[in-house]
Amino acid sequence: MAQMMTLSLLSLVLALCIPWTQGSDGGGQDCCLKYSQKKIPYSIVRGYRKQEPSLGCPIPAILFSPRKHSKPELCANPEEGWVQNLMRRLDQPPAPGKQSPGCRKNRGTSKSGKKGKGSKGCKRTEQTQPSRG
């Protein structure tokens, strides 16, 4: 009788612990479920990440991060040529003296009428891309 009670209690404890070990990464992962039907322009993208089926997502995908942080990531098929070209372009460091597409520094006068102040988000030093791995 004592063995039966111990076995039941052990089974209950095990059953309660299993869901916590499966979700111990801090929550579920956002997965792309279908690909965008339109080509995504370089001018609206700031970076990307890869989605692998081996990590629990249903399809392989490239998730492009839009420049506007309030917008959702854009999913694309990693086998399409335009997707590979866009990834290559994002991986390249910007040419010296070139600004990112979203930077408006030195494009005339600001609202206050002062020149040369630069605009929010524009860096005066050379920008570097974070390494992808």
Curated annotation (Swiss-Prot):
Source superkingdom: Eukaryota
One annotated GO molecular function: chemokine activity
Biased composition (Basic residues): 104-122
GO cellular component assignments: extracellular space
Record's subcellular location: Secreted
Keyword annotations of the record: Chemotaxis, Cytokine, Disulfide bond, Inflammatory response, Secreted, Signal
Signal peptide boundaries: 1-23
Disease: Mice carrying an autosomal recessive mutation designated paucity of lymph node T-cells (plt) show dramatically reduced numbers of T-cells in lymph nodes, Peyer patches, and the white pulp of the spleen. Plt seems to correspond to Scya21b.
Function, in words: Inhibits hemopoiesis and stimulates chemotaxis. Chemotactic in vitro for thymocytes and activated T-cells, but not for B-cells, macrophages, or neutrophils. Potent mesangial cell chemoattractant. Shows preferential activity towards naive T-cells. May play a role in mediating homing of lymphocytes to secondary lymphoid organs.
Name of the featured protein: C-C motif chemokine 21a
Native organism: Mus musculus (Mouse)
Native organism taxonomy: Eukaryota, Metazoa, Chordata, Craniata, Vertebrata
